[in-house]
Amino acid sequence: MMLSIISRLTMTIPELEEYHWAQRKKWFEQGKMPKKIRFREICYPVFRLFLTVDRLFRKQTVTILNASPKKGGKAIYACTHIFENDLENIYEKLGRGCWWFVGDPRFMYRHISGLFAYLNGVIFLDTDNKEDRRIAYLRSVQLLKEGGSLLIFPEGARNGTENLPVMPLFSGAAKMAIETDTPIIPVGIEQFDKRFVINFGNEIRPIDFQNDVELTKTLRDTMATLKWEIWEKEHMQERASLPTNYSKQFRELFEQKIDPYDTPQTIEQTRFHTKAEVEQNAVLTHLDKLIPCKENIFLFRKR
């Protein structure tokens, strides 16, 4: 049963997450899939105007290094993920309408941005819910099969590293592309205070790859190249000129820019972890349960 807006306004964020997950599950079981795809694409100029006005109020500017190569036909826009407003600024400059793939909406459930996303077309999911991830994937596939387009952040979390252009990617975008024969448009974005720089890449055709592993690797390499081109254009600092406490400064700046419901801990949990990372963590986890003795003391020595 749908709760009234007033009732939802009194709910906590965890309660809202549980409520909306239950709604998504019910709609999926009832066979409800993305609707009014074409109508929402036609309404894109209205959304774009709203985003432009909002950006001007934030006193932000956007520079396009290379424009988007695809204006018609379905596509998956795979974007690097940085700070707040990256999605909005990319979408404003995209030049066409598409649905958004958004994980862990949290505050968006009771914020005007959530209503905006819903009107535009969005697929929400809780990233720690396996069933919700499956439903979001299937709804995305259906959207693409119906001719719609999708904007997604395959890193799965904001990039909080000091020197990685792109973190390891989830394979979902590649699997969607292969299953629906949809080209992927890689997008790199970087922020310099109030100025954003966006770099659109050429389309990657899934038919050119044998499997999603190869496609994901190529996608990440291409996204990293797009970010590197931005850094090169902006004349980033050389390593020798960086302050000795640069890492600390970066972490402090990063934590200031992420939304209040994101923390370095939650970002670490939601990003993609490679098999090597998982195996390493599994090896080290048992150390917390070991009782030091002369037979195992070597495991606790700092190297």
Residue ranges and their predicted role:
Residues 2-23, 134-303:
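Non-catalytic C-terminal accessory region of glycerolipid acyltransferases
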Residues 7, 11, 36, 40-58, ...:
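Short hydrophobic helices that act as membrane-entry/anchoring signals
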Residues 23-35:
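A short, surface-exposed helix-loop junction/capping segment
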Residues 41-45, 132, 215:
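Soluble or luminal CAZymes and related metallo-dependent hydrolases
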Residues 47-81:
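Helix-to-loop junction immediately C-terminal to a conserved catalytic motif
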Residues 62-64, 123-127, 206:
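Short acidic-hydrophobic, aromatic-tinged amphipathic segments that line or gate anion-handling sites
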Residues 71-130:
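Catalytic core of membrane glycerolipid acyltransferases/transacylases, capturing the structured
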